[in-house]
Amino acid sequence: RSSSSAASDVYKRQIFDAAIVNLFFSDNAADAEILGLEGDFIYLTDNDWVLSGAFSMLDTELTKRLALTNDIVEGSELAFAPGYQANIAARKEWGMSSGNTAHWQGQVTISDDSFSDIMEPNRALQSGYSLANMRAGVSNDNWVAEVYIDNLTDKRAEISNTFVFDRERIMIVRPRTLGLRLKYNF
């Protein structure tokens, strides 16, 4: 069992110093049109390869400004909407004489340029990128042991960009990561 309660009584109207604390609000800023196509596939070959992938293509446009600001430009692209994105993976599994199953997998992901915001003062171009990952391992019904390399080329791809508190902050994908993954089913 648990329970909780809270009570508050606030008399002050100005509890933050507006000179140093930005006010955040969320509002519908614009109407937009989006024309797109997406798809995915999984294909199992006769020799135990699995090929899989997905893609999306987008054409976006801000069509009408709703917010009372000139910082939103009609005709510009939506934020975080790359013109295309795709990924493809190839995985091979084979039985071993020990009764275990070995596997190898490679994956490539690509993304086109995109923008970080629809507000012009906060809008930054996020360059397109491609990433590659690889893994190999052995498994059975009880456990999995796998070595992996994520971000094989060590690309510092920008995946998000904000101007929180009027300072640009860029988020990138994790750098090249090598690891060993062990999993045991109880």
Model-derived segments and spans:
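C-terminal beta-signal and adjacent terminal beta-strands/loops
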Residues: 8-9, 109-119, 138-186
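Single conserved hydrophobic/aromatic residue that forms the stacking wall/gate
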Residues: 1-7, 11
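Residues that define the transmembrane beta-barrel architecture of outer-membrane proteins
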Residues: 33-35, 82-86, 128-132, 141, ...
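Active-site micro-motifs of SAM-dependent methyltransferase domains
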Residues: 12, 59-62, 154
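Gram-negative outer-membrane beta-barrel transporters
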Residues: 26-119, 183-185
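Feature captures outer-membrane beta-barrel proteins of Gram-negative bacteria and organelles
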Residues: 85-92, 130-136, 169, 180-182
